[in-house]
């Protein structure tokens, strides 16, 4: 076999494999469109580095924690972190994958964060996966017009401590990479959960 023939065969095989890869990525995008996204929960809530367990209130804080909270109120800084968990259900017979996801989170209608999670996510065929979205914010900066008591109570409401509910809104837009190009889901997917 001539060198030219070998080169052409290698070229055609390589192109064929590349186009198969592109077709596979297109199929994954189609599968992603068929997936459903549902708000699952909020967990791993921390305020000033204090773990807020379910139903915890200010009266559950020890003396050291109360001093830290008083200092934070004086400085008007209340860092809070938590995870928003989303159920992604894949009804397809093959896996659905995303390379990254834009998201917008609101608390009681106020935008907390608008950013991108760059972790790749793979949802196996005919199954569900829970995607945890880490959130970090400062409640004093976010709710600057509110009283200190209302702002502190909001952190505890996230942990389910109050009869007054907190409305958590989430919009997500997943992406998939096709032939090196990032393609976005057609629109943001909106979810909402009232925590009480």
PLM region spans:
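Bacterial N-terminal signal peptides that target proteins for export
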Residues: 1-8
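Post-signal-peptide N-terminal segment of Sec-exported extracytoplasmic proteins
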Residues: 40-77
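C-terminal motif of bacterial Sec signal peptides marking the signal peptidase cleavage site
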Residues: 16-19
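Terminal connector regions
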Residues: 139-196
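Intrinsically disordered, low-complexity Pro/Gly/Ser/Thr-rich segments with frequent PxxP/GP/PP motifs
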Residues: 107-109, 113-149
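Bacterial signal peptide processing site
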Residues: 21-24
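Short, solvent-exposed loop/turn segments enriched in Ser/Thr/Gly
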Residues: 79-84, 169-171
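Asparagine-centered strand-capping/turn motif at beta-strand->loop junctions
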Residues: 88-95
